[in-house]
Amino acid sequence: MKRQKNWTGLFLGTALVCLALVVGLTVSIDPYMHYRRPQLDKFRYEPKAEAERSINNGMLRHLDYDALLVGTSMMENTKTSLADSLFGCRSIKTVSIGASWWEISSLEALALEHNPELSLVVRGLDMTYFDEAPQALHYEIGPYPTYLYNDNPLDDVYYVLNRDVLYSNCLPMLLDAAEGVTPGLSNLDDYGAWKQEVYGPRAAMRRDAPYADAVQEALSDQRRERVLYNVREKVLSLAEANPDTVFYYFLTPYSAAWWGDLRQAGQLEAQLEMEELVIREILPCGNIRLFSWNTVRELTFDLANYKDRIHYGPWVNDWMLEQMASGEGLLTKDNVEAYLSRERELFETFDYNTLFDQPEPAQYGAPEFFLQ
């Protein structure tokens, strides 16, 4: 019996020592920058796309920056280096693929809370989420690490005793340091950026059947109220509470194939009404610059720019930054009526079946329009 107790004590003692070592290693390296500023003189930090939700919190709290690029996959290919050059800023990028308006707004709020130097925010307003549920959180894209965002220290157990954090982050960073890998933070241009993809009509449309017409449904009162709530609570409230920060927002330019699917589903009218609501709510806000390029045919009607119905190539991200810096595509009280009229005319009258006639791109890369 005594021998059994000794073995039990030895086992428990060993287990506690091992747990303490894991906790100590995670806290000391802190790969997600949860506790402190990154130790850029000791370790190599390389934010990974598969851990976007986990590392964004630490980046926003502990990196040095005065500009923020934030959003979903619509922002993943946006380059901090180009933003720095165009706007004369020092930017970071925090992205979360498929995130809701609530989640992206929470990242903005976190940055504004912890960084009084923040003077510029660039964000894409995903048009698919205009009328989503007010507190929507998209778990289908992966778990949301609440323990990294709340203020409950007891929840940190999910971080400091996390197998993925240990094996995919701490140990590789420790080995890099031992092997003399240059410490620092990897280029955030690459954070979340896609590998080379296949673009063109076949990839964008992913259909063989022709587009059909349908009776269009008007926007319901319930959806209208959701749109107004979302834009007021997740866009305007942040800008109004931070008058010294300038917010560059843009409507994410989806392809004509997406608009064709909307029309076939009878949702084109509702989508146009939602967009108009969003625009008219935002325009009076003095520190928001709202941009849209939905009516630029060389962009939205050329499927060589898209790998699916909504995701555009990295050259589009570059172009949009350049457009924002030069003020092109800015919506104002003087041009909004012409823009809304032009957009409605384009997407209501376009023959979407002509999209099948577009040739496949000869090679990967930006169409000529974006090379001018």
Report each predicted region and the residues it spans.
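Hydrophobic membrane-insertion alpha-helices, especially the h-region
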Residues: 10-28
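Alpha-helical transmembrane signal-anchor/signal-peptide segments
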Residues: 29-52
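Short extracytoplasmic
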Residues: 45-69
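Loop/turn elements at helix/coil->beta-strand transitions in domains of secreted/extracellular proteins
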Residues: 64-66, 89, 116-120, 242-247, ...
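Membrane-embedded segments
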Residues: 70, 74-156
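Conserved, well-ordered alpha-helix/loop/beta-strand core segments that scaffold catalytic motifs
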Residues: 121, 202-285
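Secreted/periplasmic serine-hydrolase-like ester/acetyl group-modifying domain
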Residues: 124-125, 134, 138-241, 337-372
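C-terminal regions of proteins
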Residues: 276-372
